[in-house]
Amino acid sequence: KGDKTNVIVVSIPDYAYTPFGQGNSGVSTEIDFYNAYAKNYCEQNDITFVNITDITRQGLINTDLVASDGLHPSSLAYSFFVERILPLAINKLSD
């Protein structure tokens, strides 16, 4: 089996904050439930967890965070994801 110290778990983006999702609070609630479970699991098992959901929840206010399909994160959103994930990945790869 692999070494869990090399794993980074990323939260689920919230597509309710896109034109496709139309602010559906039920979707956000389910995503919060799953992300809380994943974060808790990671904390209990010493696995790195990165929250990117808050970035995607700005999608209805900042439409530049949503791709032209009205559903997926844009390249700008992904650049913010990378800002959070890359330093952790570099650290893990350098160990």
Q: Model-derived features: where do they sit?
A:
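A short helix->loop->beta-strand "cap" motif at the edges of active sites that frequently abuts
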Residues: 1-6
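Catalytic His-Asp segment of secreted/periplasmic serine-dependent ester chemistry enzymes
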Residues: 14-95
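Alpha/beta-hydrolase-fold catalytic nucleophile elbow
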Residues: 10-11
